[in-house]
């Protein structure tokens, strides 16, 4: 079964929305998805890099945890999941994902941690020099067929580029408020 982490931040979204709505939107979506397919939903992680660019934290509730702190946590978590035996790990985020390909601090920390965890895990399991061995000569052919250990952990925005193009989207406005309703 896929293992899924709801990932988000505690960020002020005005008086009309809950602090943490970015994570709550992911949790609700995964609850709906769980009715349609078998997945393991990990406890949500709310403590991302929210920043204070919209409002200062005082009296608002935003809690910023820097990417430099998120990275070691995420790397340890992913390493633990790999050691358990999971090979289909996903995190979904709804915070600053309007340009997910380029990335923002929270998702970049988790993406980098995923790569580092996989590299370290493979080196631990296969030994140093594993990628340069003869049995890896067909790596790129296997990769095209989907057999790639670097696909064991993937990050996803809650809303695809197409969804964002087709529906009004904003920060704490009509789009995000509608998402919470």
Outline where the language-model segments fall.
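Extended, histidine- and acidic-residue-enriched regions that form the cofactor-binding/catalytic faces
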Residues: 1-181
